[in-house]
Amino acid sequence: MPEPVAEPALNGLRLNLRILSIVMFNFASYLTIGLPLAVLPGYVHDVMGFSAFWAGLVISLQYFATLLSRPHAGRYADLLGPKKIVVFGLCGCFLSGLGYLTAGLTASLPVISLLLLCLGRVILGIGQSFAGTGSTLWGVGVVGSLHIGRVISWNDIVTYGAMAMGAPLGVVFYHWGGLQALALIIMGVALVAILLAIPRPTVKASKGKPLPFRAVLGRVWLYGMALALASAGFGVIATFITLFYDVKGWDGAAFALTLFSCAFVGTRLLFPNGINRIGGLNVAMICFSVEIIGLLLVGVATMPWMAKIGVLLAGAGFSLVFPALGVVAVKAVPQQNQGAALATYTVFMDLSLGVTGPLAGLVMSWAGVPVIYLAAAGLVAIALLLTWRLKKRPPEHVPEAASSS
């Protein structure tokens, strides 16, 4: 974890601008993810002629690479400093675009082209884990550990914004100039971000002996489990709300997803200081309660308005879960290990979103679509109970956690 430079307290607009000046690098990395997201499956299946399996694999490779490389990103950020990790990650985003470009140029050799696409996706996954983890830690190093929750919140806001912006823009660029034009745009985005990052002042890496990975995992896994359980609610809404509306014979599934996103972002903007004021665990328990009510409303909905209110509440409830628990998780380890702690904590969400779809699909095929929302509410209730137990633990078992309140 970087050591923040002592300076007068930041607040309000100046604080947010300072954070945004760093998390914009994560925005750039996620823009390189969003731009090809709606293009590559159709390109692999319809243009290159490969099966739907390969189309799905090309997309999934990035997520697997992110999952496997994220703990290394946190550890190297602790050892080398977050700026170097961010630049390294952005270089990976640039190389992914180069992979797409060469894949487009070798379209007459489908197997070679597919391998180059896969290589680009793997490099992108590694780049994103380094750029995302590094930008969070860089932001904390710039504004101080008191504002960890706000840095995490802004990082997630720019993530969703980049993905929402990137997908439609990617389709436009692809129709305009094909895969090669899209690849050049991706390379340009990454290159501009690299050139903006290099001149920025370096935040020093923390001094001290790092804890072994097993020790870091032992400090944060309970917070990660609570996050993973709560993420199931997000997973079933993002993956199956369209199918839920189809089964019910309703229109407006896309609007429901928009409501979820607006509630998610709006809650973070409305309550930027909530974690500092009442503590991460308290905020998490409030969020779990709201998310449970929302998921239950969706599960028992007999009218479209009930489902929409439920989705809105679920989005608002899930919004602050990641930063609220993350603040406590990273403060459960010494400062020189907080990068590894944040990365390890984030892996639990990655895993949860990876397994929620298949498991919910099995439950849905057995008991129907609405049941998955009731089951997700039950998982969030377990997260609420787990967080309540964590709050009741003696303070010495979660060092520095109280400082977030």
Swiss-Prot record:
Record's SUPFAM superfamilies?
A: MFS general substrate transporter
| GO CC term, one of those recorded | plasma membrane
A Pfam family of the record is: MFS_1
Keyword annotations for this protein, in alphabetical order, are: Cell inner membrane, Cell membrane, Membrane, Transmembrane, Transmembrane helix, Transport
The way this protein sits in the membrane is described as: Multi-pass membrane protein
The cross-references to InterPro entries, in alphabetical order and at most eight, read:
MFS (IPR011701), MFS_dom (IPR020846), MFS_trans_sf (IPR036259), MFS_Transporters (IPR050171), MFS_YhhS-like (IPR023008)
Annotated PROSITE patterns: MFS
Residue spans crossing the bilayer: 19-39, 47-67, 85-105, 129-149, 157-177, 178-198, 224-244, 252-272, 283-303, 309-329, 344-364, 366-386
One annotated GO molecular function: transmembrane transporter activity
Q: Where does the UniProt annotation locate this protein?
A: Cell inner membrane
**Which pairs are disulfide-linked?**
none
Q: State if Zinc-finger is listed as a keyword.
A: no
Superkingdom of the organism of origin: Bacteria
Q: Which family does it belong to?
A: Belongs to the major facilitator superfamily. YhhS family.
Q: What is this protein called?
A: Uncharacterized MFS-type transporter YhhS
By which gene is this protein encoded?
A: yhhS
